[in-house]
Each structure stands twice: as structure tokens, then as C-alpha cells.
């Protein structure tokens, strides 16, 4: 699967989740997306589940952001294999939903 297909899979997954849990749009045009490579110490620990340090120990992470309405969803993946680790949803200054991937 190519990188563009992986990005579309992420967007579709996030759109479905946001619609199901928060009643958000399922139109991809309503979502702003961005990918960024960050060092772990650049992540805001207040916007991560408490157990994040237990499941992820790499120095760098790839974060894909999806903004829709008043929410920002993110997927944190491994840099090398792009395996999904955590999905979180932020509303204002707090984490309102998260999902762990094995």
C-alpha cells in the first residue's frame, strides 16, 4: 500500500470515528490534515493518555493531525514502519477520547 493510500485510510478511519462519537462531518473536505515528525519531548503530555510512555519508547514520532469543527484528532505512528500506536481526540485544552493500537 502506498503512502497516499495509507493517508486516505487514516482520514477515513478518523472521519468514521469522529462521526460516530462526536457527530462530526464525514466529508473529507471538512477536515484539515497535517503530518509532522516530532521528538518525544515536543509532545504535550497533557494531551496524551497516561500510559503512553509505557507503550512507546522511540525518540521520534510521526503525528498526523485531523482538524474538524472544534476537535483535533491525532494518530501517533512509528517513524520507521508507520504502525499506529495511539489515536487521540482533543477538544479545547483536553483529551476527550483515545484509542490504543496493538
Question: Model regions: which residues?
Answer:
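N-terminal trafficking/processing presequences and adjacent post-cleavage segments
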Residues: 1-42
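Small/flexible residues
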Residues: 5, 85-87, 102
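Short acidic DE-rich linear segments
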Residues: 2-3, 96-102
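Generic detector of bulky aromatic hydrophobic side chains
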Residues: 17, 92, 99-101
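Acidic, low-complexity, intrinsically disordered interaction modules
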Residues: 32-96
